[in-house]
């Protein structure tokens, strides 16, 4: 499953011709060195491309429009090496349509106290030029990322690399297409939403298909293809029979193999990157898709249960943003299920009926076939595991009627105090920040859903930057959250974001 194209980022340095050719030569030389060193650092998920120094209105405008036209360009990093009169940037910025980062840095890290003169001052005045440029971008109301510090500082490089992933999420958002297999679960509110507004805001296409249309693809899968995939399952996972006859167990597993192959063929043929199902409308499917959906998520597809297309799109988006990350720990659809309220051991047990992505699993993954009361179908095969420990974020995109809101909660994943042998699903257990009581109150006050798109591999800052680029509200629930401040923030936001 492809998770986006091989994007690149342009590095554009601002200056002017006031200082003479020698100064401009050094500006270009310094810019080249920075780009070369950044690319050599191994810190960046995408290549940075040096561009000639921008010193005139015409060149700035031409460069930004070339960036617009280049499908491989995911964004522009701007740096003002010298002073660069900001009126020169107006037309270029006005016509630019991709992610923008202002790297507010300078070539030298330390002031050369013994030798500094006015030539050096004119040549190295980012503190001056960056403010001029920043003023104009702010006046024009353009959303961008500002990162200030020395370019060789590891923390600055980490922030710039982090922004790259957000920029790719911004670019790829308009390529997300969600296949709805049947409609939302009846009478459920939070999984509903304005699909037209979502396409206008995020670029998402959300289409519905009768369940039996996709079921035909499942029925057309050959027994030979099913047998090959079942063999892969048996080689990869621990099979826990729970007393079932081995052949009967294998038949249930084979049903999910057929669903996985059929669904994937349908999604590839129709060019969808996310899918939703609903246990209340399974048509001719023999089982609720469980193992099949888990495997599709692991391949990069988004998923939402009970028709939740917003969460399906967010899971896909976050998988794209985290793609290729070293030591990636996983991204999945999740659902808040039940609490542990023992003082000092508070947390939320996260799971779903079946569909938690094994990318978040810690250690060996097992397969079980167990009854499922919902759906009125055969006992479905599913992958069973517990999730990794460590920090992550849970996000929820909700439709408030007049606008979308993205909730972002920082969480700490932990191991449960005891094993849960009778619970045949993939699970995670986390304590939300700042604590369970405050986080739950804040989540409910902000209107968050019971479904989330969860990841270990992205940060609240990255998702908040994505929301800002989309022009929607982001509500952070983290270690600094208090209910009083959050309630005030929600009131202020309602005035700013409401139509």
Residue ranges and their predicted role:
Residues 3-26, 175-184:
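Short beta-strand segments enriched in small/hydrophobic residues
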Residues 25-41:
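Short catalytic helix/loop segments, enriched in acidic residues and glycine
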Residues 45-47, 104, 109-244:
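Cap/lid and interdomain-hinge subdomains that line or gate substrate/regulatory clefts
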Residues 60-73, 90-92, 260-269:
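Short, well-structured alpha-helical segments in soluble
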Residues 73-83, 101-103, 272-277:
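Periplasmic-binding protein-like
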Residues 231-232, 236-324:
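Long, internal scaffold/assembly segments composed of regular secondary structure
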Residues 300-425:
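C-terminal catalytic subdomain
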Residues 375-499:
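Extended hydrophobic packing segments that form well-structured cores
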């Amino acid at each position: 499953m492809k998770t986006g194209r091989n994007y690149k980022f342009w590095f554009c340095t601002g200056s002017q011709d006031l200082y003479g050719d020698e100064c401009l030569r050094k500006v270009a030389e310094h810019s080249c060195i920075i780009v070369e060193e950044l690319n050599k650092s191994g810190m960046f998920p995408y290549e940075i491309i040096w561009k000639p120094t921008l010193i005139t209105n015409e060149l700035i405008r031409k460069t930004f429009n070339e960036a617009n036209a280049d499908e491989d360009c995911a964004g522009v990093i701007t740096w003002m090496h010298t002073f660069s009169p900001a009126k020169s940037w107006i037309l270029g910025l006005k016509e630019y349509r991709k992610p923008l980062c202002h790297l507010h840095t300078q070539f030298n890290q330390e002031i050369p106290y013994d030798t500094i003169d006015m030539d050096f001052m004119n040549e190295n005045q980012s503190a001056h030029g960056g403010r001029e440029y920043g003023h104009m971008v702010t006046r024009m109301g353009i959303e961008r990322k500002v990162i200030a510090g020395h370019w060789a500082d590891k923390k600055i490089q980490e922030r710039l690399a982090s922004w790259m992933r957000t920029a790719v999420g911004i670019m790829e958002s308009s390529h997300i297409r969600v296949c709805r297999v049947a409609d939302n679960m009846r009478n459920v509110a939070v999984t509903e939403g304005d699909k037209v507004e979502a396409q206008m805001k995020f670029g998402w296409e959300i289409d519905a298909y009768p369940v039996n249309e996709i079921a035909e693809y499942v029925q057309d899968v050959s027994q030979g293809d099913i047998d090959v995939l079942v063999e892969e399952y048996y080689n990869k996972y621990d099979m826990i029979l729970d007393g079932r006859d081995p052949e009967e167990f294998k038949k249930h597993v084979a049903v999910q193999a057929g669903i996985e192959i059929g669904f994937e063929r349908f999604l590839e043929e129709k060019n969808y990157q996310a899918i939703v199902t609903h246990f209340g409308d399974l048509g001719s499917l023999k089982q609720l898709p469980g193992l099949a959906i888990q495997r599709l998520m692991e391949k990069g597809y988004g998923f939402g249960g009970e028709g939740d297309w917003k969460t399906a799109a967010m899971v896909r988006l976050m998988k794209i943003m985290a793609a290729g990350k070293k030591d990636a720990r996983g991204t999945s659809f999740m659902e808040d299920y039940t609490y542990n309220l023992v003082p000092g051991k508070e947390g939320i047990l996260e799971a779903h009926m079946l569909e938690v992505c094994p990318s978040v699993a810690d250690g060996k993954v097992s397969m079980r076939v167990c009854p499922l009361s919902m759906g009125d179908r055969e006992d479905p095969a599913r992958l069973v595991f517990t999730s990794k420990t460590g920090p992550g974020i849970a996000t929820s995109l909700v439709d408030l009627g007049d606008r979308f809101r993205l909730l972002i909660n920082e969480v700490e994943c932990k191991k449960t105090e005891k094993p849960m042998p009778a619970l045949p699903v993939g699970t995670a257990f986390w304590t939300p920040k700042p604590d369970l009581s405050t986080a739950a109150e804040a989540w409910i006050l902000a209107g968050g859903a019971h479904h989330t798109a969860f990841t270990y591999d992205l940060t609240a800052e990255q998702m908040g930057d994505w929301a800002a680029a989309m022009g929607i509200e982001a509500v952070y629930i983290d270690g600094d959250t208090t209910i009083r401040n959050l309630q005030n923030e929600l009131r202020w936001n309602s005035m700013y974001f409401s139509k």
